[in-house]
């Protein structure tokens, strides 16, 4: 029969598989165009990775287009179904040359991340945005949902609490852990 590619990779020395699951909500996955990724496919991949490697490194984002309290609940439920305790949650962040970047420019979110007021971003605003980027999980910069930034932060902490996640991130090569510097209740204005 056909050999499991994860088993072959593990035999060859691979010790970690990382998945950008992003969300457990089919609606959010559709809105962020995850190119055929479904919750069901991710459940299979996570379960199989955990079986072969003992651990699956999955990243999740909160604050994507269409994000609601219900979609965050769906993400928590996905983690619970597959027995996954994620290391933490990131806030959806726009990076240059990505679909999120173009959407953030269109919605005025780059200027809002710098000045607190949505609007067009000139070169100075974009430079300030780049200088303030930091880590994806330390504050809300480009909230694409209709929820206030404070609610996105609250939902993130609620999900972390429900799953027993520690916002501790494991180095992919050394296995060392490092606690993230997320401040409860922080928003982009607090950076």
Regions found by a protein language model. Name each.
Residues 173-191:
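C-terminal non-catalytic accessory extensions
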Residues 1-178:
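A structural motif corresponding to the C-terminal lobe/cap of the Radical SAM core domain
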């Amino acid at each position: 029969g056909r050999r499991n590619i994860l088993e072959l990779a593990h035999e060859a020395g691979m010790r970690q598989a990382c998945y950008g699951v992003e969300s457990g909500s089919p609606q959010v996955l559709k809105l962020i165009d995850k190119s055929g990724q479904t919750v069901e496919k991710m459940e299979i991949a996570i379960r199989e990775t955990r079986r072969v490697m003992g651990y699956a490194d999955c990243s999740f984002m909160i604050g994507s287009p269409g994000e609601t309290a219900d979609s965050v609940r769906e993400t928590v439920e996905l983690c619970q179904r597959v027995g996954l305790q994620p290391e933490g949650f990131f806030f959806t962040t726009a990076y240059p040359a990505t679909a999120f970047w173009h959407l953030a420019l269109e919605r005025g979110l780059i200027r809002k991340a710098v000045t607190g007021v949505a609007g067009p971003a000139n070169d100075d605003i974009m430079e300030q945005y780049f200088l303030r980027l930091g880590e994806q999980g330390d504050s809300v910069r480009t909230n694409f949902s209709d929820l206030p930034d404070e609610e996105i932060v609250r939902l993130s902490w609620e999900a972390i609490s429900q799953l027993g996640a520690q916002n501790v991130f494991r180095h992919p090569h050394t296995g060392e852990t490092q606690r993230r510097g997320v401040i409860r209740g922080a928003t982009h204005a607090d950076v």
